């Protein structure tokens, strides 16, 4: 008998594949990909979901037969058969009856406890610090606990993320290490961040008892601030208009797909896959409030897979994050609060009122259409969710031509592209090579279907 267990939210991935003779499991998908006896048959639904959502839903991966464990799951393999069970249900967390004042105070106590448990006896700690609320909440508690905190910032120059983080670090008198980056690093934000941090550690620039265990605010904006939810979405769900609710969710979360890339007969099928996938996930949660079901959809899909790229390469970069916002006791407390109160950072903003006073003496960056920071922010700073800076003509043309060659390579490669016709890729290649319009997003989507 073999049993695999995942953590309560499934934040650390465990992939598995089995046939009648063996079970193969690993914490990195690339391990299974490297094994010749594990079939690599593309799952078109998994690929389409990755393009639209950024990740496959549920236990799906991009390969048929290869699964990833869900939240709080036990998968049991035996000669009598395989079973999957849950040892914890997030939808069974009861709603707490308490005043808003008591809620913010108790949340602060629980959050402080989660940080102290993870800090152990460390005197010096390293923590990421951006211009937002999540990392500031962590740094504020660490600093209040008496730890010597060195902060690390990896944001573009003259951005709110950089300037507000620096101002807060200076306000409470702690070191601030900043490495300005491009708005969109070529190899992705997470890879670029990991490389920067690894280099800093290897050069001895991060003064911490456990420099490989940096504190990170991942999980705060969705878990506490209800990002990707709004009041209209809750209203639609409670009125039973689930399809309209999902459509609204796709809009506010900017979830889309380049349907014109596909054959006409496949477009409706793919679109229906997205709606059905979300509906199936909502049906898993037996919540009295349909709004809570959508929150849990985000937690056990978007947030569960939020740090997969970090944990899958743990053996390569050797970085282990401290993630108090993913603490199960803290999340259980947050789940017990009314979802309306948590929406749009309403609870989060009230929660800030019980943090040390210095936490609120420097402005912080907020999400669009969420509760605004009461302090004024310099207008000359770039905003994370604002329009991207304009490219130079040369950079724009160069980028499109590069994408055109990629499209041409895909079209001429004999590898299977599933529902993507080669004729469309050739047309895309022509448009991109002539720099007529930017369809690089469609080229990247087509590349995900490539197999072989």
Residue ranges and their predicted role:
Residues 2-98:
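N-terminal segments that mediate ammonia production and transfer
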Residues 3, 11-14, 18-21, 79-81, ...:
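ATP-dependent adenylate-handling active sites, centered on carboxylate activation for C-N bond formation
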Residues 28, 43, 262-263, 418-421:
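Helix N-cap / beta->alpha transition motif
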Residues 30-31, 156-157, 367:
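Short beta-alpha junction loops
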Residues 357-437:
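PAPS-dependent sulfotransferase catalytic core
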């Amino acid at each position: 008998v073999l049993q695999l267990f995942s953590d309560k939210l499934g934040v650390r991935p465990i992939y598995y594949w089995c046939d009648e003779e063996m079970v193969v499991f690993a914490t990195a998908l690339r391990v299974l990909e490297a094994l010749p006896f594990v079939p690599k048959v593309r799952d078109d639904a998994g690929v389409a979901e990755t393009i639209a959502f950024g990740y496959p839903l549920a236990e799906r991966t991009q390969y048929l037969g290869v699964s990833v464990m869900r939240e709080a799951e036990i998968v049991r393999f035996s000669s009598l058969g395989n079973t999957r069970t849950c040892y914890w249900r997030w939808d069974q967390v009861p709603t707490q009856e308490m005043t808003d004042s008591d809620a913010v105070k108790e949340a602060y106590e629980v959050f402080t406890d989660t940080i102290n448990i993870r800090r152990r006896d460390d005197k010096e700690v390293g923590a990421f610090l951006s211009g937002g609320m999540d990392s500031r909440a962590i740094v504020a508690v660490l600093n209040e606990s008496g730890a010597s905190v060195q902060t690390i910032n990896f944001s573009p120059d003259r951005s709110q993320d950089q300037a507000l983080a620096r101002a807060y670090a200076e306000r409470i008198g702690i070191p601030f290490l900043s490495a300005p980056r491009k708005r969109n690093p070529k190899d992705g934000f997470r890879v670029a961040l990991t490389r920067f941090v690894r280099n800093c550690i290897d050069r001895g620039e991060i003064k911490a008892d456990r420099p490989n265990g940096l504190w990170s605010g991942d999980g705060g904006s969705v878990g506490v601030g209800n990002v990707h939810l709004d009041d209209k979405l809750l209203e639609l769900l409670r009125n039973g208009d689930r399809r309209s609710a999902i459509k609204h969710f796709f809009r506010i979360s900017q979830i889309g797909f380049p349907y014109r890339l596909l054959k006409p007969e496949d477009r409706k099928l793919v679109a229906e896959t997205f709606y059905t996938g979300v509906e199936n996930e909502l049906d898993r949660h037996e919540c009295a409030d349909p709004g809570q079901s959508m929150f849990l959809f985000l937690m056990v899909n978007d947030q569960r897979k939020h740090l997969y790229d970090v944990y899958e390469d743990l053996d390569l970069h050797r970085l282990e994050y401290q993630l108090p916002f993913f603490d199960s006791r803290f999340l259980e407390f947050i789940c017990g609060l009314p979802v309306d109160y948590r929406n749009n950072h309403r609870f989060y903003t009230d929660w800030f009122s019980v943090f040390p006073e210095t936490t609120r003496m420097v402005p912080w960056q907020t999400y669009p259409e969420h509760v605004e920071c009461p302090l004024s922010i310099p207008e000359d700073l770039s905003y994370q969710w604002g329009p991207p800076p304009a490219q130079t003509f040369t950079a724009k043309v160069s980028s499109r031509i590069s994408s055109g060659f990629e499209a041409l390579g895909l079209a001429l490669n004999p590898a299977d592209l599933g529902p993507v016709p080669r004729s469309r890729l050739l047309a895309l290649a022509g448009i991109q090579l002539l720099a007529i319009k930017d369809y690089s997003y469609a080229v990247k989507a087509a590349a995900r279907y490539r197999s072989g």
